[in-house]
């Protein structure tokens, strides 16, 4: 729910047109011919799943997902709400200079999961897990089952290696993005479990406390994370479900979240979506076509702290509960004052249309600023933040109701940035945001997102090199 400067006239780059090949993972979708889903995935690493991964697929069952708070109920809800995948044939590559799912055009659905590495897991077993995850992710992003044999073609005397709920469904633009939390490098008790404490980027630290934080322990942190985005919720759920089974005995879900209705656009080809407050959100989000801005604000560069992270990014996750019932009783003019934009057009209250640059000096008939000094737009705008920008990939969420009948809903905020300081500066600037009266932050996490996997390689390979 941050504000960014609208792009000028961005130059098209590889990835903005579906029919143009691109060199990076996630930048260019392809539409496979009918029947192509049965072919081996060209983008998959050549190695297969380890014996331990296959054991996990055979023995984990639903246990891996049950470890996540509310995960079972959430999965059931997502599957039952699955939209028709007819025509959803977009396929993104898994390997490339950067991981897919960052500058990739934001899909409509999300399943996010944070994991804890199991006690007793060794460095070699962690590496093997990342290799197994990469193999499976490369297959699933191409519309394949998680491993040979799949849901129905294996031994009838053994559990299927694939859960099968994505049988017959296309790839649906699935992207799978991996991240490493601070506690992967140094455990909370100070232990260097995997011999990588000295490779932790200096910036990768637990986020400080912010105004409005009401964090729940079960919605924070994680050694690892996986972000699965797709245009069909069942495809995204299938990905997290099977990756969790593969992790059995090595890692388990700490917490997870389902999201719908993206709350930002990451491509100029996408219209601005609305959040659950009913306002257009992320009007001026960083777009993938803004190549110079993406390089400066999103990707970690050579010389930035840890060399192994060059080409990667930092992911900040915040679960923001909206106090829906209070907001719904607010007058329209109050809602617009809080946001700083009109609810219909999304134009700044200083005048113009949605993409008109806000004029923070404009005053009305009473000599009061047309855009309130505590409005979200003013406080989060890059001109107020020395040019700081974030690339957002947030989603709406509804997790039922609380025991008082109030809607448990809001924004699952995700932003990618070159340095965590960018997010910290923005969030601190929002300390006096008028919106704080209507929201509370209940979940929080930060992860280092490594660069993309090389062909036949695996995500995280640079960290353990």
Regions found by a protein language model. Name each.
Residues 1-49:
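N-terminal secretory signal peptides
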Residues 3, 48, 53-74, 79-465:
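Long, histidine/aromatic-enriched segments associated with O2/redox biology
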